[in-house]
Amino acid sequence: MAAPSVMASSLAAFQARARHCLEASQQQVCEQALLEAEALQRRASARSAYPCQTLLLGVQADLVMQQLQAGRGAQAVADLQVATRGCAGL
């Protein structure tokens, strides 16, 4: 189970960290964003917010790809914005 600070992560804080990962490729930031994405997608699942969960799974894939230096650049950032809108209120 994730640390309480990860579980309490707000969607806005996650978005900022994930965007930083996607734009700057800093491994530590990417790892934290990935942990936050996991916590958020589990929260979405627990609330039966399956469209949001699906969007977050896509963001997780983008974060992993970024860690592997195979990121999708601007498309990944655009998908993060879509996920943030699709998960409003999570």
Map each language-model feature to its residues.
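Short cysteine/histidine-rich zinc-coordinating motifs and their immediately flanking basic loops
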Residues: A33-L34, Q41-R43, V64-M65
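Mid-chain, structured segments of secreted extracytoplasmic proteins
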Residues: S45-G89
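Surface-exposed polar/charged interaction patches
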Residues: C21-A24, L40-R47, L90
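General helical secondary-structure elements
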Residues: A13-Q15, R43, L68
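Immediate post-signal-peptide N-terminus of mature secreted/exported proteins
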Residues: A2-L35, A39
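Residue-level detector of intrinsically disordered, flexible termini
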Residues: M1-A2, Q75
